[in-house]
Amino acid sequence: ESGDYIFPQTESGQSMRWSKFKDKDPRDIFDIVSQRVFPAIKKMKHGKLPDFNMAGDLVEVNEADQYSNSENTAFSRYMEDAMFLIPTPQVLQKIVTGLEDLYTHDIADGDMQGDLYEYMLGKLASAGRNGQFRTPRHIIDMIVELVEPTPDDTICDPACGTAGFLVASAKYIREHYEDTMTSDQWDAYASTMFSGFDTDRTMLRISAMNLMLHSISNPDVDYKDSVSKQNDISSKYTVCLANPPFKGTIDAESINDNLKAVTNTKKTELLFLALFLRLLKKGGRCACIVPDGVLFGSSNAHKSIRKEIIENHQLQAVISMPSGVFKPYAGVSTAVLVFTKTGAGGTENVWFYDMKAD
């Protein structure tokens, strides 16, 4: 059982297990969760929780643990600044009882736990911040199906938010290839197959948790301003999927020079297109959401990124979406671009589709 690996085999280690504390008195549950479980999760390493000594002090997981196979870096890193905000034992007991009831009757199946988490994210993230709009689930699924990811792909979302595209790609791969995947492919699936970047640490914490609930035990999500000088990744991925921020501009000084060489602009929606081309290996596919301005804008920066994609790579599809897709931002008109990085052109027949309803 995986829990035997995660929890220390001591009395204090075992006391952190849900089955051990869920039926206790509310005060005891509160003490165990706030003083043990929560601090332990923040210090999780190699997929293992740390233990506590007799004085109640946390004992960190040994770095050289012979059983450690992969460090749970993303999860512990983005839990570092998390705060325990549940105010009283009674509130926590209601949460524990509610989750136990839900688990017993509905979500013992792992996929359901992920679905529940995504449902809660929908409630949490209905408000767009800094140009982020929560991408509706059915639009994400459509985009993933257009790209048809396989277990041999390495998939990146450089504006990952809550990791919706990465989770949908993981589900697609499992649904289509679960019976034929090799152990090496499963190892990659759990760690290196999916990468995400964001500039919001809260989002990274949420996305790491979302991926872990979908069997990606050591997700590669990182704090990175994708279009800045700090991001020097190139030719690493075979698939890019994203709904990059398209309300923002970025400080000209911090923009990565090789993106400016493709499109000299401060507009994030254009810089991200140049970024996708840089992140992808030759032959890599991209499907991304862009505002209509990218298709019709008349500035030199708009023209140069369109020319780059059409003449030097292979544009395959432009799918115009209804303006109400991003409720409640009804005024935002968007499209999906699908293209392949070739470095040698190849744009011939482009599929244009006008989606009237979603």
Model-inferred region functions:
Residues 1-146, 150-151, 220-229, 320-324, ...:
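Non-catalytic, mostly N-terminal accessory regions of nucleic-acid modification and defense proteins
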